[in-house]
Every structure is written in C-alpha cells, then in structure tokens.
C-alpha cells in the first residue's frame, strides 16, 4: 500500500498522540472524522499501523536494573533461543546483530536475583557478555520517522 500526504499527516498526528480523536484529526487536516477513520482502518488492515502503545516509566514501576547482554551461540539452536526469548518478559528487546555476538538483548528487571536467574537460564544456549546500565542518558521514541523536516 502506498501512503499519500494525507495518510502521512494522519500518521504524524497519531504518532504524537495515539489517543487523538478522529474528529480532531479531521479538523486539523480538513477532513471528516469518518473519512479519517476509514483511512486509519485501511492503514491498519495493510499493516502500516501495527499497534498502539503506551510508554511507562520503568523506574517508577520498580524495574531498577537495565542490562545489555551480548549473546554468543554455542550451537545452531537459534530457534530454541528465539522461543526462549519470546517467553521471557524480562527481555524487552532482542536484536540479531553482526560482529562477534549473535544477539543483543535488553533486559529490564527489578532485582539482581531475577537478572542472575535469567542469565543462568541463558547458559544452556550459549555464553554472554553483560553490561549494566548505570544511568539512562537519553530515551527517544523514534518520532523522526514521522517528521516532514
């Protein structure tokens, strides 16, 4: 599906506030709320819009430990590892990477004990290097994708 400039404007507004009313979007781009809703539905159906989300403060939720785990496979058990990753809520992000490591995992937990348990479970798939975050200095939700600048 190709998106046009109107779809792009709708995406920009939704990116700033996913809870914005269709009517309000319509007022900003000179369309009816129903027409906006139809365009949004079409973008959802075509996979342009995959989900709507919230952003929580992990520290206020009690998740005070953030770790980055470079993971090195010791066998060709990638499918098993991916299934394991999918079941673990402590792993908030997982990326297949180039270089020496096979995967980069972002782990967010509320205690060292939980982190240690996860790391022990990972050992059946390979080895890791662990980097603990001391302080988050920037967190950016990629709104630049929706920028027209």
From Swiss-Prot:
Residues 3-64 form the HTH asnC-type domain. The keyword Kinase does not apply. PROSITE patterns: HTH_ASNC_2. GO terms for biological process: response to amino acid. One of its GO terms (molecular function) is sequence-specific DNA binding. SMART domains: HTH_ASNC (SM00344). It comes from the Bacteria. GO terms for cellular component: cytosol. Negative regulation of glyA transcription and kinB-dependent sporulation. This is HTH-type transcriptional regulator LrpB. The gene is lrpB.
């Amino acid at each position: 599906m190709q998106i046009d400039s109107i779809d792009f404007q709708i995406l920009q507004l939704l990116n700033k506030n996913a809870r914005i009313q269709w009517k309000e979007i319509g007022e900003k781009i000179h369309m009816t709320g129903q027409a906006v809703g139809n365009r949004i539905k079409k973008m959802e159906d075509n996979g342009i819009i995959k989900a709507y989300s919230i952003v929580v403060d992990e520290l206020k939720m009690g998740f005070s430990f953030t770790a980055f785990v470079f993971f090195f496979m010791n066998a060709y058990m990638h499918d098993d590892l991916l299934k394991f990753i999918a079941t673990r809520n402590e792993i908030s992000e997982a990326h297949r990477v180039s270089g020496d490591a096979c995967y980069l995992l972002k782990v967010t937990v509320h205690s060292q004990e939980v982190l240690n348990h996860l790391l022990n479970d990972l050992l059946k798939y390979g080895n890791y290097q662990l980097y603990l975050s001391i302080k988050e200095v920037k967190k950016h939700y990629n709104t630049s994708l929706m920028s027209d600048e």
